[in-house]
Design a protein with these regions (language model features):
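A conserved hydrophobic helix/loop-capping motif in glycosyltransferases and polysaccharide synthases
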Residues: 3-15, 19, 26, 39
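Residue-level recognition of the N-termini of beta-strands and the immediately preceding loop/turn
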Residues: 2-3, 32-36, 72-73, 101-103, ...
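Short, acidic, metal-binding catalytic loop of nucleotide-sugar glycosyltransferases
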Residues: 21-33, 41-51
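Residue-level signal for alpha-helix termini/capping positions
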Residues: 24, 28, 96-97, 125
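Catalytic-site signature of metal-activated, phosphate-bearing donor transferases
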Residues: 84-89, 111-254
């Protein structure tokens, strides 16, 4: 199989090297061909928060290095603020032009091992009539030594279905050329005993900016986390959970 890996990144150097390590190993030694396309982009909501177009950490420098060393087959830099799906569509068009069989979307705080990737693709290969697959994550939060279960987003999408994969119309949401929304197509969840992927998500180290972004995007009460300005740390937004009648997540210690 030929796999197209796509991602959009901005100010994400904290876990970037760890994120791409498994993919670099797979590209060099894996059973299947991997075509990688990343785009550097600052989301539109961040423009309203005063963020510059260019990252102020080492993200762009690292992307440049991955491209020059051959891990990235395509690397684009957006010269304007794009929504996530608009940025990812740049990457999607790149990998589709390379004739990939599946498109795999990732966030650059998701840490797949070589074994995770290999086992997931074996599962995909065993289910050729399935159009898309969800992946289970361990969402590491706060100090990074505890995690939350239950996050299982769509990640892998078959290209040769419904006239071909066309584009993203929202963050992780695809439509096919015949107008079929991927949600209407057959899907499977990759079982946890095959892969339960490490996701360095809502942490004290990155939480303040994420809360500000989510509030700008979803409204003042639209984020399940809050930033405690007195203690300078991330906390659960209890008002959000009460308002939506959602129990607070269970924290699992490492």
């Amino acid at each position: 199989m030929k796999i197209g890996l796509i991602a959009s990144g901005y100010n994400c150097d904290q876990f970037l090297a760890e994120c791409v390590a498994g993919w670099r190993q797979f590209k060099a030694h894996g059973e299947h061909e991997l075509v990688c396309s990343f785009v550097h982009n600052c989301f539109k909501e961040n423009q309203e928060l005063g963020f510059p177009l260019e990252s102020n950490d080492k993200t762009m420098e690292m992307f440049d290095s991955y491209f020059s060393k051959g891990f990235l087959d395509y690397y684009d830099v957006s010269n304007k603020y794009l929504n996530e799906h608009q940025a990812r569509n740049i990457c999607l068009n790149n990998v589709l032009s390379s004739g990939v069989d599946y498109v795999w979307t990732i966030g650059l705080d998701e840490i797949y091992s070589f074994e995770d990737i290999s086992k997931i693709l074996k599962f995909v290969q065993m289910n050729p009539f399935i159009t898309w697959f969800k992946v289970n994550y361990k969402n590491y939060v706060f100090d990074g030594n505890q995690w939350i279960d239950g996050f299982c987003p769509p990640r892998i999408f078959k290209v040769a279905a419904h006239g071909g994969l066309k584009e993203l119309y929202y963050d992780d949401d695809f439509v096919y050329n015949d107008g079929t929304d991927y949600k209407a197509a057959p899907c499977l969840e990759v079982p946890r005993n095959i892969a339960h992927v490490k996701h360095m998500t809502w942490l004290h180290s990155n939480g303040k900016a994420k809360v500000e972004y989510q509030k700008k995007r979803w409204g003042e009460d639209g984020c399940s986390y809050s930033w405690n300005y007195d203690e300078n740390k991330l906390i659960f937004n209890t008002d959000f959970h009460k308002k939506n009648n959602i129990p607070l997540p269970t924290l699992i210690k490492e």
